[in-house]
């Protein structure tokens, strides 16, 4: 857990990564959330290792479509499904960003995610979720999320312990 001392419109506030973790865990679409903020050396950025709920995108629906079509679905369909997942997480990211801005009365909050693992059944989605409490370019958040995602995939994640 880390704690940030920030200034908002009402004065000084402290934001604990454990409090933000509770916000993420309260979402029904996030099955698991682990605070890994202390593992990075980035000022005013919190990071979480997350797993999307298995109920959000289910292969049972895909199996039904396959049966209806009477043929195998090609890789294009899975590319479309992956883009649907990214769009879903982007919407969730926007909602979380807005919730944090409202809760802490902060304007300078940016959130970003990077999917680092999807199993072959398309039911297990793991991603890193970053929250920046400073003025930062989206390209910097993108690069940082990709680096952390690679680290999690290579064994730092609780999911692979």
Each predicted region: which residue ranges?
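Short, non-transmembrane alpha-helical segments in secretory-pathway proteins
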Residues: 14-24, 93-101
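Amphipathic protein-protein interaction modules
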Residues: 79-137
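Short, cationic low-complexity segments
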Residues: 67-87, 150-161
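Short, solvent-exposed secondary-structure capping/transition elements
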Residues: 55-62, 105, 109, 141
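N-terminal interaction modules that seed assembly of large macromolecular complexes
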Residues: 17-70
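N-terminal presequence-like segments and adjacent domain-start helices
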Residues: 1-12
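A structural detector for beta-sheet-dominated domains
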Residues: 7, 49-51, 116, 130
């Amino acid at each position: 857990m880390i704690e940030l001392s920030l200034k908002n419109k009402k004065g000084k506030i402290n934001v604990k990564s454990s409090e933000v973790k509770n916000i993420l865990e309260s979402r029904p679409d996030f099955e698991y959330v682990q605070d890994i903020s202390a593992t990075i050396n980035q000022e005013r950025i919190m990071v979480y290792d997350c797993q999307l709920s298995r109920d959000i995108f289910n292969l049972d629906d895909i199996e039904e479509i396959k049966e209806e079509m009477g043929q195998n679905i090609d890789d294009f369909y899975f590319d479309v499904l992956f883009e649907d997942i990214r769009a879903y997480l982007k919407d969730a990211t926007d909602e979380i960003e807005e919730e944090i801005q409202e809760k802490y009365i902060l304007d300078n909050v940016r959130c970003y995610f990077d999917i680092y693992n999807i199993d072959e059944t398309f039911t297990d989605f793991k991603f890193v979720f970053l929250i920046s409490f400073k003025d930062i370019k989206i390209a910097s958040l993108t690069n940082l999320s990709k680096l952390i995602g690679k680290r999690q995939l290579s064994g730092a994640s609780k999911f692979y312990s």
